[in-house]
A protein has these predicted regions:
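Hydrophobic anchor residue at the start of the ABC signature
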Residues: 142, 181
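Q-loop/switch helix immediately C-terminal to the Walker
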Residues: 85, 90-106
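Conserved ABC ATPase "signature" region
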Residues: 109-125
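Conserved ABC ATPase signature
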Residues: 100, 128-135
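Catalytic Walker B motif of ABC-type/P-loop ATPase nucleotide-binding domains
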Residues: 153-157
Length: 208
């Protein structure tokens, strides 16, 4: 069976330092892969490679058996990538950010007020995001996960600045996505609940 996402022999060099080399990775529908490692080990760099945002120094990445380079548009439509930074428009409100994402990515209609309320943002829907706390901004950014139909999620430290209630809500979202045969790659210092039966981990060693 063709792997959903596969990386073969990946190498990444940043400022003359080899972050990782000859790295192999496979991901199937319904799987959750947690990338672990110390700061500077290359976790974020690996996610950017897997998201097609940068090019490996060696190796290749295949999605559904085909290189990313020959299916960039299809891959972008199949992917929801949320980086370490929130990626929101700080001058816009939470509601306006959701409207922007829905239009830009042709996302289906949903009740934005209800969604933001479920994320603990009730009463803040019309506040410019620059006035929100780091945790509130992160929740606005993560709202995309409840909107997107992309089967592959690549998330860099999604639990950063979230309170326990928001963490539990996000983990529930993970469960729903995996049950629908979606796949997730995540970096996090948060200990993921052991009730993810498909959870796999990959450790990146810090290289001097």
């Amino acid at each position: 069976m063709t792997d959903f996402l596969r990386a073969r022999g990946l190498s990444c060099i940043r400022q003359d330092r080899v972050l990782f080399q000859a790295l192999d990775l496979e991901l199937s529908p319904g799987q959750l892969l947690q990338i672990q490692g110390k700061n500077g080990a290359g976790k974020s760099s690996l996610l950017r490679l897997l998201a097609g945002l940068s090019t490996p120094d060696d190796g290749e990445i295949l999605f559904q058996g085909q290189p990313l380079a020959v299916q960039a548009e299809h891959y972008a439509a199949s992917l929801c990538y949320i980086g370490h930074h929130s990626g929101i428009h700080e001058q816009l409100t939470a509601m306006e950010n959701i409207a922007f994402w829905r239009a830009a990515y042709q996302l289906p209609y949903s009740d934005s007020m209800q969604l933001l309320g479920s994320l603990g943002l009730a009463g803040l829907e019309d506040v410019p995001c620059r006035m929100l706390s780091a945790g509130q901004q992160r929740r606005v950014s993560l709202a995309r996960l409840w909107l997107t139909k992309a089967p592959l999620w690549i998330l860099d430290e999604p639990f950063t600045a979230l309170d326990q209630q928001a963490i539990q809500r996000l983990q529930q979202c993970f469960h729903q996505h995996l049950a629908a045969e979606g796949a997730i790659i995540v970096t996090t210092h948060q200990a993921l609940s052991q009730d993810f039966p498909s959870l796999r981990t990959m450790e990146l060693a810090y290289r001097w």
